[in-house]
Amino acid sequence: MNSSRRQEGSPLDLNNLPDEFGKQTVESSTTTAASSAEASRVTKKKSNGGKDEAGKVYECRFCSLKFCKSQALGGHMNRHRQERETETLNRARQLVFGNDSLAAVGAQLNFRDVNMGGGGAAAPPPTMQMGGGGFRGGGVGGDPCIPLRPVQPRLSPPQPPPYHHYLYTTTAPPSALHPMSYPATYPAPPRHQQPAAVGDYVIGHAVSAGDALVAPPPPPHRASFSCFGAPLAAPPANVQPDNGNCNCSFGCGHSNRNVNAAS
């Protein structure tokens, strides 16, 4: 019985072991040893990498600050970039506002120059001194000021009074002469010139208070009449020498004189 059982072979029997039993155990032991060695190597690498990161220092290139982690350095650099962007924006705004203010001041200067009659002319310098009132114009705080220009009203020269021609009789004294207005059809004689005598009448002009009208004496033996504007060679047809009336068409018919008495 016992011998038959041994021949059948039981797995617990050490005398009846298979031939490959020892090889399997050796292989399993070698695989477990290799896996444990690899795991130890990975842990060593991790531990060495942590030591390297802990010992490295990161420095900022803007303010020379040092950080232990790269994440902290990145946040710090972002702040520096934001500050630089705000500075550039402020500079651009200042330039834009400065150009706008200068353009507005130039437009005001040109508009005022046009109103003062100096359109198209260049604006004068902002500083000016005037002798009479002691006024000094200048820019305050970079804002130019317009100099004061003395504006003098244009006075037209006084026009001379219109010349009126008058007719005077020569038989009456100068104080009793009565001038008669007569429309001027010919240019008046210049001032300070002795009026010419035509027949028994004197053609003159308006004189001032200081001037004296001196009539030349009439011709001794001349009883003919003439009218202003009529030819001197022959008397006009409407003149009657017998009764001494001057019937001119110019409105001098009311001045009558007796020729016979004068002769």
Curated annotation (Swiss-Prot):
Gene3D superfamilies: Classic Zinc Finger. Residues 25-40 have a biased composition (Low complexity). InterPro entries: JAGGED/SL1-like (IPR045320), Znf_C2H2_sf (IPR036236), Znf_C2H2_type (IPR013087). GO terms for cellular component: nucleus. It is found in: Nucleus. Its main location: nucleus. GO terms for biological process: cell differentiation; floral organ development; negative regulation of cell population proliferation; specification of carpel identity; specification of stamen identity. Regulates floral organ identity and cell proliferation in the inner floral whorls. Probably specifies the identities of lodicule and stamen through positive regulation of MADS16 expression. May contribute to morphogenesis by suppressing OSH1 expression in the lateral organs. This is Zinc finger protein STAMENLESS 1. The gene is SL1.
